[in-house]
Curated annotation (Swiss-Prot):
NCBIfam families documented for this protein: cynS, PRK02866.1
HAMAP family, A to Z: Cyanate_hydrat
Gene Ontology molecular function terms on file: cyanate hydratase activity; DNA binding
Active site, per annotation: R96, E99, S122
Lineage of origin: Bacteria, Pseudomonadati, Pseudomonadota, Gammaproteobacteria, Enterobacterales
GO terms, biological process: cyanate metabolic process
Reaction equations catalysed: cyanate + hydrogencarbonate + 3 H(+) = NH4(+) + 2 CO2
Record-stated family: Belongs to the cyanase family.
Matching SMART domains: Cyanate_lyase (SM01116)
UniProt entry keywords in alphabetical sequence: Lyase
Official protein name in the record: Cyanate hydratase
EC number: 4.2.1.104
Domain of life: Bacteria
UniProt-listed PANTHER family: CYANATE HYDRATASE
Amino acid sequence: MTQSLHYSSPRETLTDTIMMAKIRKNLTFEAINQGTGLSLAFVTAALLGQHPLPEQAARVVAEKLDLDEDAIRLLQTIPLRGSIPGGVPTDPTIYRFYEMVQIYGSTLKALVHEQFGDGIISAINFKLDIKKVPDPDGGERAVITLDGKYLPTKPF
């Protein structure tokens, strides 16, 4: 039976347990994800408390991290989403995404509306990918793909 959480602390506690096991076992998110049949981004978000995992994927993850049956069930619950507390983020990496939206948010909105019409890009019917590529000027670049379904506003 599908269960849902009405507050975030159970998943936050589980996330702490998961992260400690990941560190203790010296595992990457990629290694934990192997065998789940799901994307790396989705499983990582689930391990950080933002998505439920299907039972099979929860069991694969639990085996790698030595999690118990209660943790397996909790990994399958629908969480209270939103991992960033109110206000401006202070973590430098998260802040840069905030900064990108501050600078390019109105541009993205204008271009989405111009190309698609009045509506939104779904974060539910959504895929996320990140790749590291060489920078021709030296160093490396991050290529981040946000792939969401367009949902038009429907008058009623």
